[in-house]
C-alpha cells in the first residue's frame, strides 16, 4: 500500500498520506491517529455492522460513521464541521510488484441533510491516485465531485473499473484483487487493530488459522435412512395386518346385528297391519252411535221452532196495540223534546265555561305583554301600550260579567285583535334579524376556533396564497436556498412602536424572501404556477438587488425599532423603513417627507392618513406575535360566545310571544259571537220545565197493562229461541264429530293398504334368505295371548337396542377405517356398506415375503457401516493430519525468532472432550474391510458404534460437532526458555501487560502469515495503539519478525513508544491538529527503490 487520500473525513478536508514498508503513525492524544486507521476499516471491511470505530479504546469508544463523515465537534453553537449535503472519499493506492503496475481502491459516500448515506465502492486497475480527479470547478470555485458525477467520469476514463453499490460484492472483488484472500481476512484485520486478550485459543485458531472443511456424510446417512425405512416398513406391515384383521372382525359383528334388525322389522310390519285393522272396526262402531244421536236432535229442534213462532206472533200483536195508543205517542214526543233540549243546553253551558276561562287567560296574556320590558331588538310603543291597557280592562269586565257584552265591548275586542296582530308581525321581523345575526356570529366563532388551534400549533394564520408560494419554493429549491416570510424573521425592540410597524408594513409583512443567488429561479417558479395555484397578490422580494439598501438608514427612522434575523431580512427592513421617520406627535409629521407617529398617523406625499385599526390590531411580527394573536383571538371568542348566548335567549323569547299572539284576532271574533250565550241557556231551561209538567199529567194505566203482556210473550220467545240455538249447536257438533270419524276411517283404510303393501315389500328391501326365519318369528309372536300393542312395543324395544348396538359397532368400524386410512395413506371408503377394499388389502399383506424384507434390512446396515469406515474415518484422519502439518510449518517459522530468551510454539493435541473419538479415528487398525461389529477391540468397537450412531441419527445439523475435524483437537501457545515451558492459557491469568501482548502479536502475525501463504498478496498488517504495553526490546523484536515475514506494517503508536520503533521503521507519520483541521508530516521517507515497490525478502523459505 503506497498512499491513502482522505477527503471530507472527520477533520481531514483533503489529505494524502504516503506509506513505506514499515510505517508508524504518531501524534498527541486526540490528534487523529485512530481516524486514519478507521478510514482503512471502512475501506477494507466495508460492512458498517462489522466495524468498531476507535477499537483500541475498548468499550469507551462511541464513534459512529456519521460523526466521522460530518466531523463531530460537539458544541451547541456548531455540532459538526460539515452540515447539509456533501460527498466523502476514502481512496488507497497499491503497487502490484508481480504485475509491475498500480491500482486504486476507494469508497465515495453522499451524505444528505437528514444524515441519509449512499455508498459506492470502486476498484480501478492500472491507475494511481494522482491520475484521478475528485474535484470540479464552477463559477471559479472548487467543489468536491458528487458521487454520481465522479462514477460517471471513472467509467469513461477507466472502462475496466469495478464500481459496486453492494458492500458484499465489493468485498468479494477486493479479496480477489488482494491475491485471492480468504474471507477470514476481514475478521483477522479487525482483530489486529487493538490488543484484545485471547481468552479462548481454540476460538482464535478457528477464526484465524484452520479453515473449516466440509466432510460429506450424505451417502452414509442416506444408506442408513434406507435401512431405517425398510425397518419401519416391516413394522408397518405387521401393524397393518393386525389393524385390518380387527376391521374385518368388527364388520362381521355388524353383519350379524343387521340380520337381527331385518327380521325384527318384518315382525313389526305384520303387527302394525293387525293393529290398523282393529282401529278400523272401532271407527265403524263410533259412526253408528253418532248417526242415531243426530236424528234425535233434529226432531227436538223442529218442535221448538214451532213454539218459538207462536210466541213471536203474540209479541207482534201487543206491539201493534201499544204503538197505536194516543198516550204512547204523546209520552214519546215529550220525552224526545226534553232529551234534545237538555243536550243542547248542556252544550251551551260547556261552551260558556270554555269561553269564560279563555277570557281570563287572554286577560293574563295581555297583562304580561303590557309588562314586557323589551330590549335593543324590540320594545312596545306608547300607543301599543295604551291599546293593550284598554283591551285588558275589557277582558277583565267580560270575565267578571259571565261573558256577556255589548257594542262597546265588541268594538274594543276588534281593536285589540288588530293591535296584537301588528305586534306579532314586529316580533316576526325581529326574530328574523336575530337569526341572521346568530348565523354571522357562529361563522365568526368557527373562524376564530380554527385560528386559535393553528396558533397553538405555532402556525400563523397567513393568507392561503402566501403559504402555497412558500411551500412551492421550499419544494423546488430544497437545499439550494432557505425560504422566509418576512414577519417571522423580525423582532421589535420597543413595543411602543409595534402598532406603527405592523400598520405601516401592512401586507408587506407577508412578503417572501429567498437567498439572493436564487431569486431569479424563484421568480420563474412563481410565474409558472401563479394561475394554477392562485398565487396572485403575494410579494416575492428581489433580495439580490435589495442588498444595496443594507445599512442605508436615516437617524430616527422606524427601521431603528426593528431587527432582522439575517442580512437578507435586514436589507428588506432598511429598504422599507430606513426613510420613515418616527414623529412624536401629529404636528411633527410635517417636518419630514415620510413619517409616522406611535398612534399610527402616517404622513407621505403631503397626505396624512390614520392607519385603520384592523390593519395592525392583529400582530404578526416577532417571536411573541403568536402569543399576542392568541390572546386577542381568545378574547374575541369570549365576546362572540357571550353575544351568541344573548341572541339565542332573545330568539327563544320572541318565538314564545309569536306563539302566544298567533290567531288572537280570530279568537276575539269568536268571543263576540258568545256574548248572548246566557239568554239562550235561560230559554232552553224554560221549555224543559214546561214539557216535564205536561208529561206528569198523562193517564198511562191502560198502556202499562199492554206493556206487561208484551213483556210476558217476549220472555217466552227468548226462551224458545235459546233452546233452538242450543239444539242447532248440538246438531253441528254431532255432524262435525261424524265427519271427523268418517275421515279417520278413510285414513285408517288407506293406511291399512299402505302397511300391507310395505309388509309385502320387505322381501325386496332386505336379504331374501332371511324371509323364512322372519315368517317363523312372526307366527311365534302372534300365537301368544298378549295384546298386539304390547307385543309390538316389545319388538320395537328389542329392535331399537339392536340398532343402537349396530350404530355403535358401525361407528367403531368407521373410526377404525378412518384411523387406518390416515395412518396408512389408504384410499378405502370409510362409509362403505361392504368390506371388500379392506379385505383385499388384508389378503395382499398376507401374501408378502417377510423374511426377504428382514434380509434387505441387514444388508443396508452393513453398507452404511462400510461407508462410515471407508469415507468418514479416513477423511477425518486425513484432515487432522493436515492440521498438524500446517501447525508444524507455522512453528518452523516461529522457531527462528527469540523474544529475549523466549521462543514461541503452537501446541496441538487431542481434545479432552472428544479424545475417545480421536483415538479411534487415528487408530490405523480401523480399516474399511473390518466391520464395526467384528472389530477385535470391543472398547474401540463400542466407540465406533457410538460415533456412527451420533452421525446417522437425527436431522442434518444436529451433530455438526462430530463432522468438524477441529473439534477433535485442543490448541495452545507455548513460551519456551532456559527455565522451562509455559503456556499462554496460564500466562493470560498470571503475567503483566507486555508479557501478555507478545503472545497476542505472535498469534496475530501467525494468522496473517497463514492468510498470506500465496506470495502475490497485499501482505498488509495494521495495528492501532500498537505495542503500548511492551518494552523496547520486545517492540524491536516484533518489528524484525514482521520484516522477516515480509509483511507491510502500518501502526498507530503512542508518542512514548515512537523512539523505540524509529530504528526499525522506514517511515514515520506525525498527525497534527489545529482547531478542527488535521494534517500530516512525514519525518522520514522510504528509500527510492521502496517508493516503486516494497523490497522482497526471502522469508517464505522459512515456511515452505
UniProtKB/Swiss-Prot annotation:
Matching InterPro entries, A to Z? P-loop_NTPase
Effect of disrupting the coding gene: When this gene is missing the Wadjet system does not confer plasmid-transformation resistance in B.subtilis.
Q: Which GO terms describe its biological process?
A: DNA synthesis involved in DNA repair; double-strand break repair
Q: Which Gene3D superfamilies match?
A: 3.40.1140.10, P-loop containing nucleotide triphosphate hydrolases
Report the protein's function: Component of antiplasmid transformation system Wadjet type I, composed of JetA, JetB, JetC and JetD. Expression of Wadjet type I in B.subtilis (strain BEST7003) reduces the transformation efficiency of plasmid pHCMC05. May be an ATPase.
PANTHER family with a match to the protein in the record: DNA REPLICATION AND REPAIR PROTEIN RECF
What is the protein's given name?
A: Wadjet protein JetC
Which species is this record about? Bacillus cereus (strain Q1)
Tell me the classification of the organism that encodes this protein: Bacteria, Bacillati, Bacillota, Bacilli, Bacillales
Gene that codes for this?
A: jetC
Amino acid at each position: 500500500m503506497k498512499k491513502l487520500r482522505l477527503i471530507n473525513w472527520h477533520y481531514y478536508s483533503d489529505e494524502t498520506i504516503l506509506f513505506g514498508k514499515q510505517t508508524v503513525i504518531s501524534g498527541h492524544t486526540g490528534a487523529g491517529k485512530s481516524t486514519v486507521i478507521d478510514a482503512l476499516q471502512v475501506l477494507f471491511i466495508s460492512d458498517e455492522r462489522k466495524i468498531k470505530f476507535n477499537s483500541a479504546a475498548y468499550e469507551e469508544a462511541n464513534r459512529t460513521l456519521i460523526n466521522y463523515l460530518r466531523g463531530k465537534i460537539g458544541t451547541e453553537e456548531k455540532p459538526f464541521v460539515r452540515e447539509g449535503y456533501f460527498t466523502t472519499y476514502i481512496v488507497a493506492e497499491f503497487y502490484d510488484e508481480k504485475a509491475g503496475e498500480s491500482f486504486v481502491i476507494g469508497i465515495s459516500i453522499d451524505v444528505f441533510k437528514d444524515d441519509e448515506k449512499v455508498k459506492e465502492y470502486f476498484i480501478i486497475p492500472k491507475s494511481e491516485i494522482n491520475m484521478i480527479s475528485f474535484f470540479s470547478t464552477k463559477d471559479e470555485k472548487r467543489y468536491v465531485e458528487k458521487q454520481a458525477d465522479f462514477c460517471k467520469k471513472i467509467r469513461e476514463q477507466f472502462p475496466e473499473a469495478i464500481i459496486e453499490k453492494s458492500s458484499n460484492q465489493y468485498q468479494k472483488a477486493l479479496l480477489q484483487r488482494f491475491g485471492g484472500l480468504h474471507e477470514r481476512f476481514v475478521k483477522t484485520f479487525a482483530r489486529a487493530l487493538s490488543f484484545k486478550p485471547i481468552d479462548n485459543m481454540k476460538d482464535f485458531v478457528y477464526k484465524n488459522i484452520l479453515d473449516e472443511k466440509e466432510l460429506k456424510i450424505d451417502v452414509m446417512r442416506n444408506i442408513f435412512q434406507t435401512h431405517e425405512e425398510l425397518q419401519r416398513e416391516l413394522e408397518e406391515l405387521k401393524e397393518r395386518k393386525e389393524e385390518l384383521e380387527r376391521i374385518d372382525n368388527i364388520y362381521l359383528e355388524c353383519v350379524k346385528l343387521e340380520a337381527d334388525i331385518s327380521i325384527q322389522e318384518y315382525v313389526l310390519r305384520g303387527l302394525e297391519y293387525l293393529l290398523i285393522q282393529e282401529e278400523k272396526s272401532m271407527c265403524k262402531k263410533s259412526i253408528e252411535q253418532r248417526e242415531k244421536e243426530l236424528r234425535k236432535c233434529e226432531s227436538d229442534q223442529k218442535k221448538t221452532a214451532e213454539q218459538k213462532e207462536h210466541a213471536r206472533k203474540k209479541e207482534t200483536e201487543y206491539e201493534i196495540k201499544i204503538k197505536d195508543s194516543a198516550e204512547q205517542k204523546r209520552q214519546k214526543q215529550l220525552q224526545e223534546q226534553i232529551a234534545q233540549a237538555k243536550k243542547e243546553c248542556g252544550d251551551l253551558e260547556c261552551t260558556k265555561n270554555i269561553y269564560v276561562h279563555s277570557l281570563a287567560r287572554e286577560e293574563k296574556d295581555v297583562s304580561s305583554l303590557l309588562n314586557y320590558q323589551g330590549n335593543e331588538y324590540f320594545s312596545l310603543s306608547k300607543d301599543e301600550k295604551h291599546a293593550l291597557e284598554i283591551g285588558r280592562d275589557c277582558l277583565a269586565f267580560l270575565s267578571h260579567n259571565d261573558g256577556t257584552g255589548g257594542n262597546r265591548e265588541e268594538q274594543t275586542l276588534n281593536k285589540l285583535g288588530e293591535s296584537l296582530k301588528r305586534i306579532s308581525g314586529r316580533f316576526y321581523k325581529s326574530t328574523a334579524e336575530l337569526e341572521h345575526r346568530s348565523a354571522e356570529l357562529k361563522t365568526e366563532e368557527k373562524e376564530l376556533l380554527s385560528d386559535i388551534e393553528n396558533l397553538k400549533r405555532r402556525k400563523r394564520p397567513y393568507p392561503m396564497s402566501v403559504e402555497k408560494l412558500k411551500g412551492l419554493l421550499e419544494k423546488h429549491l430544497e437545499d439550494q436556498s432557505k425560504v422566509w416570510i418576512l414577519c417571522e424573521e423580525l423582532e421589535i425592540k420597543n413595543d411602543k412602536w409595534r402598532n406603527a410597524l405592523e400598520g405601516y408594513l401592512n401586507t408587506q409583512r407577508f412578503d417572501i424572501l429567498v437567498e439572493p443567488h436564487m431569486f431569479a429561479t424563484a421568480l420563474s417558479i412563481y410565474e409558472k404556477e401563479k394561475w394554477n395555484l392562485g398565487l396572485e397578490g403575494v410579494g416575492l422580494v428581489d433580495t439580490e438587488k435589495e442588498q444595496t439598501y443594507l445599512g442605508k438608514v436615516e437617524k430616527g427612522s422606524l427601521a431603528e425599532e426593528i431587527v432582522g434575523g439575517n442580512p437578507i431580512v435586514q436589507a428588506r427592513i432598511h429598504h422599507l423603513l430606513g426613510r420613515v421617520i418616527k414623529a412624536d406627535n401629529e404636528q411633527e409629521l410635517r417636518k419630514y417627507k415620510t413619517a409616522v407617529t406611535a398612534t399610527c398617523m402616517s404622513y407621505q406625499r403631503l397626505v396624512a392618513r390614520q392607519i385603520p385599526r384592523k390593519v395592525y390590531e392583529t400582530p404578526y411580527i416577532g417571536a411573541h406575535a403568536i402569543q399576542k394573536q392568541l390572546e386577542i383571538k381568545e378574547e374575541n371568542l369570549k365576546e362572540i360566545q357571550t353575544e351568541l348566548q344573548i341572541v339565542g335567549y332573545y330568539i327563544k323569547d320572541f318565538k314564545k310571544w309569536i306563539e302566544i299572539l298567533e290567531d288572537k284576532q280570530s279568537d276575539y271574533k269568536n268571543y263576540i259571537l258568545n256574548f248572548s250565550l246566557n239568554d239562550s241557556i235561560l230559554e232552553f231551561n224554560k221549555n224543559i220545565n214546561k214539557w216535564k209538567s205536561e208529561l206528569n199529567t198523562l193517564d198511562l194505566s191502560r198502556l202499562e197493562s199492554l206493556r206487561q203482556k208484551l213483556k210476558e210473550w217476549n220472555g217466552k220467545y227468548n226462551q224458545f229461541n235459546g233452546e233452538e240455538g242450543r239444539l242447532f249447536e248440538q246438531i253441528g257438533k254431532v255432524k262435525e264429530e261424524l265427519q271427523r270419524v268418517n275421515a279417520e276411517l278413510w285414513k285408517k283404510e288407506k293406511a291399512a293398504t299402505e302397511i300391507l303393501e310395505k309388509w309385502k315389500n320387505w322381501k325386496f328391501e332386505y336379504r331374501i334368505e332371511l324371509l323364512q326365519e322372519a315368517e317363523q318369528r312372526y307366527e311365534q309372536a302372534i300365537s301368544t295371548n298378549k295384546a298386539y300393542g304390547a307385543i309390538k312395543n316389545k319388538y320395537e324395544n328389542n329392535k331399537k337396542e339392536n340398532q343402537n348396538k349396530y350404530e355403535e359397532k358401525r361407528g367403531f368400524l368407521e373410526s377404525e377405517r378412518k384411523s387406518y386410512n390416515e395412518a396408512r395413506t389408504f384410499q378405502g371408503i370409510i362409509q362403505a356398506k361392504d368390506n371388500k377394499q379392506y379385505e383385499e388389502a388384508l389378503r395382499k399383506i398376507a401374501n408378502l415375503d417377510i423374511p426377504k424384507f428382514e434380509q434387505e434390512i441387514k444388508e443396508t446396515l452393513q453398507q452404511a457401516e462400510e461407508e462410515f469406515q471407508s469415507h468418514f474415518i479416513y477423511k477425518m484422519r486425513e484432515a487432522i493430519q493436515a492440521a498438524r502439518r500446517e501447525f508444524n510449518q507455522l512453528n518452523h517459522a516461529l522457531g527462528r525468532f527469540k523474544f529475549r530468551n523466549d521462543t514461541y510454539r503452537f501446541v496441538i493435541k487431542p481434545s479432552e472432550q472428544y479424545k475417545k473419538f480421536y483415538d479411534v479415528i487415528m487408530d490405523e487398525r480401523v480399516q474399511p474391510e473390518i466391520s464395526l461389529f467384528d472389530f477385535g477391540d470391543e472398547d474401540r468397537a463400542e466407540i465406533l458404534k457410538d460415533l456412527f450412531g451420533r452421525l446417522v441419527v437425527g436431522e442434518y445439523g444436529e451433530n455438526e460437532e462430530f463432522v468438524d475435524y477441529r473439534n477433535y483437537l485442543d490448541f495452545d501457545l507455548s513460551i519456551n526458555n532456559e527455565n522451562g515451558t509455559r503456556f499462554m492459557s496460564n500466562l493470560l491469568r498470571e503475567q503483566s501487560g507486555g508479557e501478555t501482548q507478545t503472545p497476542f502479536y505472535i498469534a496475530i502475525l501467525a494468522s496473517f502469515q497463514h492468510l498470506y501463504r500465496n506470495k502475490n498478496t497485499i501482505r498488509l498488517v495494521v495495528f492501532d495503539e500498537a505495542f503500548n504495553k511492551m518494552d523496547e526490546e520486545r517492540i524491536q523484536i516484533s518489528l524484525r519478525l514482521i520484516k522477516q515475514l515480509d509483511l507491510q506494517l502500518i501502526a498507530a503508536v503512542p508518542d512514548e513508544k515512537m523512539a523505540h520503533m524509529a530504528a526499525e521503521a522506514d517511515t514515520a507519520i506525525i498527525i497534527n491538529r489545529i482547531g478542527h483541521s488535521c494534517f500530516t508530516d512525514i519525518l522520514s521517507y522510504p528509500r527510492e527503490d521502496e517508493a516503486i515497490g516494497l523490497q522482497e525478502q526471502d522469508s517464505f523459505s522459512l515456511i515452505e
